[in-house]
């Protein structure tokens, strides 16, 4: 009985701190126990790595005690890297674009731990890159050969120069614009960075004989309802088409192109959890866009471990999707975070609903309607079976899209994106009007000239 436990722990025994130290408990019971503990007035902490602690004779107990984190109540299991994953980067020259970001920086941490020959961090944001550089220098010192390059993936000449200089064996392409509402307002920037940036890095990877190129994608690329998701879907399509062209001998090269696709990560820059923490510190309210909005979550370290695992098993031309577990209602997440702070939702801290933002879905999908998956040796990783695209057509289409984006015409840019990604249907966005017209990508010989001219005029008037 939760009330009985709360009374016993909080008052009768005059307990001030509860230390959770049950390493074998399953996720459901862990959440239940922590939920009961958090309803008391006690300070709740977790003793981690208890088995290792016992093996070390009980030394350094305090260093293994930490506060309860939101991932503890979401029930995400820890994933350990295999020896095969270590061989992917051990003794290799590894480049990470977007290496200062949430995913990119964690990839750098895990790669550094595997002993690469050299690690190259590429990022346009010098503060983020500098922070990761200093962290890795403190941890590894001269044992890690580390280079930080301030560069934009949009700059094809600079990208080519970096590849020529470092000759990387493995490339993780994590550089991207990711904020949905901002990209609705600046679709040309999403195209330049997410689409053309991927084009630049992938072409250089092929040109300089990179062994493996790994694209970090998102579940928002599936049946996209916003510009950001559509731009990432185009990046997926380009990488996949290039890989197919290589396998068919249409393009010279040996690079294995692999895509990894997953949902939200806990605590990434600008995401919901840091925002909730900031709102809690200010006394609330916690803002949620819709009472029924749900998202899949995994921790950043877990996502990066799965990226590395998928990179090992990939042979080229795969899109790997990850087991994201059970979806979480954002409203429930808000309540859990309030409770973790020792407060009562609706009493101490309010939750308010602000309405869906432009391009925002109530739920995300990891697979499109006509996609299905195949199992892999890792039970948390699946291979998506997706449609194939002709490389020459896609390369020409991206070149045209880049030219349109350069005009800074938002509507024209999004119109072309919808032509290339027909499943892209805008939601809560000014671009919804574009979906009212059928966009015919090729000339229909049975269509009269006057009818075709009328159709084009209607589209151009939007």
Predicted segments, located by residue:
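NAD(P)-cofactor binding segment of oxidoreductase domains
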Residues: 31-47, 118-125, 165, 170, ...
């Amino acid at each position: 009985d939760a009330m009985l436990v709360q009374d016993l722990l909080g008052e009768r025994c005059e307990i001030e701190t509860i230390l959770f130290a049950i390493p074998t408990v399953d996720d459901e019971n862990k959440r239940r126990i922590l939920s009961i503990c958090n309803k008391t007035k006690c300070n709740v902490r977790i003793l981690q790595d208890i088995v290792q602690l016992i093996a070390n004779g009980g030394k350094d107990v305090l260093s293994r005690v930490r506060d309860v984190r939101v991932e503890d109540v979401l029930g995400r299991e820890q994933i350990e890297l295999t020896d095969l994953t270590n061989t992917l980067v051990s003794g290799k020259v590894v480049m990470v674009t977007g290496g200062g970001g949430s995913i990119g920086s964690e990839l750098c941490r895990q790669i550094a731990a595997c002993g690469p020959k050299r690690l190259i961090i590429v990022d346009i944001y010098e503060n983020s890159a500098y922070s990761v550089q200093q962290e890795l220098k403190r941890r590894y010192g001269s044992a890690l050969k580390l280079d930080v390059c301030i560069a934009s993936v949009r700059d094809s000449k600079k990208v080519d120069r970096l590849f020529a200089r470092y000759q990387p064996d493995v490339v993780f392409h994590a550089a991207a614009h990711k904020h949905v509402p901002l990209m609705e307002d600046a679709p040309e920037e999403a195209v330049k960075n997410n689409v053309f940036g991927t084009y630049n890095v992938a072409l250089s990877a092929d040109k300089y004989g990179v062994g493996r190129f790994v694209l970090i994608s998102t579940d928002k690329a599936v049946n996209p309802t916003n510009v950001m998701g559509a731009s990432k879907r185009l990046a997926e399509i380009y990488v996949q088409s290039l890989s197919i062209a290589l396998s068919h001998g249409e393009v010279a090269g040996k690079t294995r192109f692999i895509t990894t696709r997953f949902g939200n990560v806990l605590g990434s820059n600008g995401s919901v959890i840091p925002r909730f923490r900031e709102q809690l510190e200010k006394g609330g309210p916690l803002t949620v866009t819709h009472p029924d909005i749900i998202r899949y979550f995994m921790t950043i370290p877990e996502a990066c471990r799965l990226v590395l695992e998928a990179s090992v098993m990939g042979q080229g031309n795969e899109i790997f999707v990850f087991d994201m577990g059970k979806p979480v209602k954002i409203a429930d997440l808000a309540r859990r975070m309030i409770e973790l702070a020792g407060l009562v939702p609706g009493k101490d801290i309010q939750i308010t609903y602000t309405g869906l933002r432009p391009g925002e879905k109530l739920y995300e999908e990891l697979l499109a309607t006509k996609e299905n998956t195949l199992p892999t040796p890792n039970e948390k990783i699946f291979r998506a079976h997706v449609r194939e695209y002709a490389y020459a057509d896609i390369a020409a289409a991206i070149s045209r899209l880049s030219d349109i984006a350069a005009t800074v015409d938002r509507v024209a840019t999004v119109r072309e994106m919808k032509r290339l990604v027909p499943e892209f249907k805008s939601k809560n966005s000014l671009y919804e009007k574009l979906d009212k017209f059928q966009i015919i990508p090729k000339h229909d010989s049975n269509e009269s000239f006057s009818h075709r001219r009328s159709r084009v005029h209607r589209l151009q008037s939007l």
